[in-house]
Structure formats: structure tokens, C-alpha cells
Amino acid sequence: MPSDDVRSPSGKPGKPDSGVPRAALRRQLLALRGALPQRPAADAGIEAALAALLERLPVHRLGFYWPIQQEFDARGVVSRWLASAPGRQAALPVVSRPGAPLDFHQWEPATPMVAGHYGIPVPDGTPPLLPDVLLIPCVGFSGDKFRLGYGGGFYDRTLAALAASGNTPVAIGIGHEACRIALVPQEHDLPMDWVVSEGGVF
């Protein structure tokens, strides 16, 4: 399990980053993620920890993300999870319009994809699916499971909307241990139920 050390954008124990403006902190963390040493080993650690967690949880409909900007690529884990038991389904997010919660549409490894908003691939013509577990990419994350994203608020709005409809999913943040930071949550921030890094699950 990862320690609760405060980490700076250098990935080393350091002072809390709560005084750094979030936009600047995102830039630092994205640059750090893009230059991580031993990236294959780190990704293998995330993959193993995530696969084990998914087998522990009662997951039937798994929402995840198409990787951008050097995010951990969960497609391999999700593909193997789908194939390992009948009745499992997966879905990718679709932006219907800026400022709205995300929609999710069914995905399988052979699903045809088209470019969606921001050029991110989305499933082409598959039905909507309501996930009971969501894998959520983290630019940064804190020891108390708060997440720093890209600043668009899509996942915060989505989690809030799903909760309001009585369909609260289990939220699993995915990030690299070097991007663990001290983060003062803002009013709209919602903690993850779990966070997975190459250091383990907490």
C-alpha cells in the first residue's frame, strides 16, 4: 500500500502543493508523467493492482476512459476482465456537450471508434450503458483520495449527477505514484472510493 507521504511534483517527499495554483500544478504533473523513468514497470504495477481490485469488487458494468496525455492505458485490463466471465460489460465516456455530465456507451475490443469532442475516440453507434464502477484518470491524487483532473469538471459533474439519480458508481482513481500530492479539496471535489497506483490500492 502507498505511504501517506506528501509528494511534490518531483515525485519525492516534499512540501504540500496546496499553495501552487491548480493550473500550474497540472502542467507540472503532466510534464512529470510524460517523463517518468521506468514507465513500463510502473504501468505493469498499476495493471496488476487494478486487475486484482476489479476481481474483488462486484462489478458488472465497468466505465473507463480512452487514454490521452500519457495516462495509464486500461484497455488491456478491461479487455481481459470482459473475457474472464460472462455478462460483463464495459463502456467509454462520451461528451454530449461541454458543461454536461458524461454519457457512457458500450465498448468491446472490436467496437468501431470515431473521433468525439476534443478528438478523443468514442464508440460508434453502441448503446448507452450505466456503469456501476468507474475508472477515472488522475493528473494528481492525494492520500485522502481526492483527485486533480484536467480542470473541466466532467467527472465531478458526472459523479454528482449519477448520485442525484440514485445510481452512484464506485469511483476508482488511476494514477502514478510520482503524482501523489497534498491537495486541498475544493467545494465541488468528490473523493474517490479507491485509488490505484503502481504502489498498490488504497
Short names for language-model regions:
Residues P2-L130:
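N-terminal active-site beta-alpha-beta segment that forms phosphate/nucleotide-binding
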Residues D4-P13, A100-F202:
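Conserved phosphate- and dinucleotide-binding cores of soluble alpha/beta proteins
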